[in-house]
Each structure stands twice: as C-alpha cells, then as structure tokens.
Regions:
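Peripheral docking tails and interdomain loops at the edges
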Residues: 300-342
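Active-site phosphate/pyrophosphate-binding segments
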Residues: 8-29, 129-251, 259, 326-342
C-alpha cells in the first residue's frame, strides 16, 4: 500500500467510523499521558506528544523510549497518579514495548493504548485498547508508510474526539494534496540530488517537527549510510553548526508563522557553506541565495501542525534516492532487522 492509499484508509477507518473505536479513552481525567516506542516509533511518539499538548491545552504528557520506561518504571509511574500510556510498534512484536505493556497491565492507575500495523500481534493482546493500521506494514526493514500511518491515525483520533471539523477536513485535504504531488516530488528530489551532492546531512525542526527531524536523520543514516544529525531549529546555532561545511545539506522542515528570525538562521547556515533545502511556502521565510531550494512551495494549509505532515514523504524520498545513488539497498540497511527482539 502506498503512503497516499494508507493515509486515506486510516482517515476512512477513523473518521468514517469503519473501525469500532472507543474514543472515550482520551476523555478520562489522566494526570499524565506517556508516549513510548523504539526507533522510528519513538520518533513518532515525540510528535504525537506535541500534538496532544497542542490540542489538549498543555495536558501533561511526555515521551520515553520503551526501554527507559521499562528499566526506570517507578521513577516515571507514581502510584498516586493516573496514567494513559500510548505506544507504537509496527509489528507489535518489539520486545521492550511488549514488556512495558505487560509490566503495567495489572496496575489499576495505568491504561494502555497501542498502535501497530499487524493483526494478532503480541502487544495488542496485552493492551487495554489497540488500533491496527491495516495494510501499512511495508515489507522493507525501513519504516516509511507505517511511520506516517500510525502517527496520522493517532492525530485523527484526538482531532475527532474534540470534534474539530476544520482540522478533520484539512487532514482529508492533506491526503489529496499529497496524491496530486507525489510523482512530481520524486522527480524533483532526484533532480535535486543529481545537482547537489552532499556528504553530511542536517535536519532541523521545532515543535511537532522535532520528532520528524529525528526520524529524517535516522532514515538518511540507516538507509544511505550518510552521516546525519537532527536538532531543534534554534538549537542548531548552539554548537552543532560547527560541523557544517560546503559538502553539507541542511533540510529545514516546514516553518510556522509563530517562529521568529528564521531568515537570520537560514542566512547563517548558508554563509557557512551549506546547501539548504526548505520544505513549504516561500512566503514565510524569504532568503535569496543560489544555495537554497524549496520543495512543495505551493503548499497552503490553515493549520501548521497538519502542514507538517508534508515533511514526511520529502525526507523519506530524499533518503531513498540518496541510497539508490550510492548503489545501496534501501530496503535492507546494514546490520538491521525488521523487528528487534531481545
């Protein structure tokens, strides 16, 4: 299943109520919501956590790698508080994530809600609530469609619970926009890589985009074996910029109107010799340089947090094409397995 097809199916399942969902799970008065996962699933957890804070008026929530929650359980789980733990695992068979749910299953103050892409998974059997993104589990070791599908499924559920019809409609438009542009996007990215070789890769993003930046870094690193790094937008100036040179590419994820002095940051990156690739509209940050290019510059979304989803196919395609150009197999990265079982 392609990314566009998967997003449309998830939308139909969640918003069209083709799958039975008990959205009251979000309505309970939890003291904290903890998101967890491993690898790419941990990265999407960071964005899911920010989305939750944004829609639930700063509800207390945070993100942990599954292993951290597993080995330091009593530090993060207080017996006097009520928790919702939300976990993500493509296969539903990742050892650390399963063990988190099993460990906390009998605690009366903890409710678990997990997402996976395969039916009958072990994690679903131990979870209080579970959602399956059917058809989103790619055969490749690398998570692409499954990553975005689980993230968009969670975000749609929360949006539906709040009955935010404007956001739900924009999520629908998101799938249509991607469907109209995906073929051209492949061509544009390949053309860009052919014209702009790079040996190091930086991705910066703030808020919801930080989790995506870490995932973009991971995709390039694991697939193409290119040294890659990810940072919050404004943290990039506090040390990491020392690594930039003329052989670098800096991918700047979609900018929101709430950000400040982005032009200065972009200009400094350019002055250090790096090439810059910016996702989204030019009207937010106008910088004139032969070393800056834009992708999906015609994108126009009312909600910045939904616009952020257009970053995902871009950084996945960038990593894929870079890998192909280096004569590596994008589906079987070095030293990696489909599911981590310990």
């Amino acid at each position: 299943m392609t990314q566009v097809e998967s997003w449309r199916k998830v939308y139909s399942d969640v918003v069209g109520e083709k799958v039975s969902l008990d959205l009251n799970i979000f309505s309970d008065n939890y003291d904290e919501i903890i998101f967890f996962g491993c690898g790419s699933s941990y990265n999407l957890s960071q964005s899911a956590s920010f989305f939750t804070k944004s829609l639930l008026d700063g509800r207390s929530c945070f993100t942990l790698p599954s292993s951290e929650l597993l080995i330091n359980t009593d530090i993060y789980i207080n017996k006097d508080k009520k928790y919702l733990i939300v976990g993500f695992s493509r296969s539903g068979e990742t050892t650390e994530s399963i063990n988190v749910v099993k460990l906390l299953k009998d605690r009366q103050n903890v409710t678990s809600f997990t997402f996976s892409c395969k039916e009958g998974s072990t994690i679903s059997k131990f979870s209080d609530y579970h959602f399956i993104c059917k058809g989103a589990a790619e055969k490749s070791i690398v998570m692409t469609v499954s990553f975005s599908s689980m993230l968009i499924a969670y975000c749609l559920m929360l949006t539906k619970l709040l009955n935010n019809k404007d956001m739900l409609n924009e999520f629908k438009n998101l799938s249509n926009y991607l469907g109209e542009n995906i073929s051209k996007l492949f061509d544009d990215v390949e053309y860009y890589i052919d014209k702009n070789n790079f040996s190091s890769y930086f991705v910066v993003g703030s808020g919801f985009n930080y989790g995506l930046a870490v995932e973009a870094d991971l995709k390039m690193k694991e697939m193409s074996q290119t040294p890659s790094y990810s940072y919050h937008l404004y943290e990039f100036n506090h040390g990491p910029k020392s690594l930039i040179n003329k052989e670098s590419l800096c991918l700047i994820l979609t900018l929101s109107k709430s950000l400040f002095k982005t032009e200065e940051i972009i200009k400094e990156i350019l002055n250090l010799g790096s090439k810059v690739l910016l996702v989204g509209s030019k009207d937010i940050s106008i910088v004139d340089s032969k070393n800056i290019d834009y992708l999906l510059s015609d994108s126009n979304f009312k909600f910045d947090i939904i616009k952020s989803f257009i970053n995902i196919p871009i950084f996945q395609i960038l990593a894929y094409i870079k890998t192909i150009k280096k004569n590596l197999n994008p589906d079987k990265p070095k030293n990696l397995d489909y599911t981590m079982v310990i």
